[in-house]
Amino acid sequence: MRRISLEDLHIFRCVAVEGGVLRAADRLNRVPSNVTTRIKQFESRLGTQLFRRQGRNVVLTDAGHRLLGHAERLLRLADEAEEDLCSGVVAGSLRLGSLESAASVRLPPILSRYHAAHPRTHVELQTGTTAALLRRLDNHQIDAAFVSEPFDKGSLSAVAVFAEELVLITARGGPRIGGAQDLADQTVVAFPHGCSYRRLLVDWFAAAGVTPRRFLDLGSYHAIVACVAAGTGVAIMPASVLDNAVMGDSIQRHELPEAMRTNRTNLVWAGEPGGPLSALLELLRVGA
């Protein structure tokens, strides 16, 4: 007799995501006592504690964290199996990760077409750096991600979908930049570690023997552009982002060396793509 059922995993995942029994019960349309009983019975069958109390909430134990990855994968496979039997209609959920640049500029028209073509598919989009998105993909928190090169492909499947022109930006009115050596002792304004564009800029500096004075880590392109415009430092970003940025006209653009001027964004995923992801891949192929 199996100790784990899909219903067990569904209830467990809901409690883990919501961080408490009351919120999970509301989402599951169950009474809280029923959810509590199901979790206790599940823990008893497994012989291990999955949650522990933290104030008014519950948090996962080490065993719970391990189970969550399996639960995400098994529930997704169950959804995919159900989708495959729905007369070819693409339905279910598609959890995407994306760089902020792609999410704000490249993806809106694509997601709009996808939404119109597949109304029974629920799309979730979250943003992050390339490294952060690859970790979420490895932890089964997302189904696919739009990431920038360079990245460690490993066993992932990948397809190049966008080509971005990268530019160096400085405050308006500053001197002409002829190379990385002209930026000695400058502050680099960038996303935190894990950003591929930051890595490209740092590698360019290192090749020229230049050491940035310091780094200012920010969480959005709007903040980066504003700080550069105020004279804080220099940054690297896609020209398409600047074209749509609120303060895009308040900075000075500089061409980068040809070898690093163009950067590709890839859609990456693990394993065989399910129905919703296959539909997105087809849409990207047709629209290429």
Give each language-model segment a name.
Residues R106, Q252-A288:
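A late-sequence structural motif
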Residues A91-G154:
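Central regulatory/effector-binding core of bacterial HTH transcription factors
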Residues Q41-L60:
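A short LG(V/I)-centered, amphipathic sequence patch enriched
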Residues T187-A208, G274-L281:
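Secondary-structure junction motif
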Residues K153-H193:
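Flexible hinge/capping segments at coil-to-helix
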Residues R45-L46, L67-G88:
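Alpha-helical linker/hinge and terminal dimerization helices associated
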Residues R13-V31:
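Short helix-boundary/capping micro-motifs
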Residues R56, D62, L85-A103, A117-T121, ...:
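Interdomain hinge and pocket-entrance segments immediately C-terminal to HTH DNA-binding domains
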